[in-house]
């Protein structure tokens, strides 16, 4: 398991005096990787039942799109005349949107890590610590959500119907079009190693760049950095739905997860500021 290698690396870095400081500061990131990989040992579907149909129909009731053409009707998993957004985009997509979707999704983890490294290397250690521990906290909240409510993503219902099959492999869904377009098997490689396909709620894809944007604003980064992060964030939200990897409901809950995580992380400072201004 990858988590074993992370634990060994962390122990080695902590044992060596010259890298001990680095190990201390990057502890949240190591813990994130260890916890995520360790979820393979006890998957969420061993704790609670997997929901496939209820989330699909909730999405349809809130954001359903009328199906009219034969291609649209064939794409509807429950054979009605109402599509979820993921089904609509499975029929209606274009090369330019597919390319942008892949670029946005590739920013999901690398940009937050790059932002953390920037804060660390430029000695903005106060903000580095706050952002790093907030990142871990948001993930922990999200992981708890996975275990409370195991849920299948849209592509599962679109490809397999509404019966949960535990050994279902990861699926690139709409992101496969990016792999085909570029000739690179990036997303096939990433989703083939997915720790658990029944972990759609909340969408941590929606959370990471939102968290990064929030801390870019809080730490008063230049306006163009904030705008760039915000655009990537919005792009990832759109891609999550466009590619069939998440429902709009998942994305909204991912946003809520981020807000809760930031409020918990910054609660002491927010309370002190409120008392000061009262």
Regions found by a protein language model. Give the residues of each.
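N-terminal transmembrane-helix/juxtamembrane module of multi-pass inner/ER membrane proteins
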Residues: 1-2, 19, 23-113
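Hydrophobic core of alpha-helical transmembrane segments in multi-pass integral membrane proteins
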Residues: 2-16
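Interfacial segments of alpha-helical transmembrane regions
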Residues: 25-27, 113-148, 154-165, 214
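Aromatic-rich transmembrane-lumenal/periplasmic boundary elements in polytopic membrane proteins
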Residues: 34-38, 42-60, 136-174
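Membrane-interfacial alpha-helical segments at the cytosolic side of multi-pass membrane proteins
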Residues: 114-121, 206-223, 256-265
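Membrane-interfacial catalytic/cofactor-binding modules of polytopic membrane enzymes
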Residues: 148-219
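Interfacial helix-loop-helix junctions of multi-pass membrane proteins
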Residues: 153-157, 200, 235-261
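Membrane-interface junctions at the ends of membrane-embedded or membrane-associated helices
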Residues: 219-226, 264-278
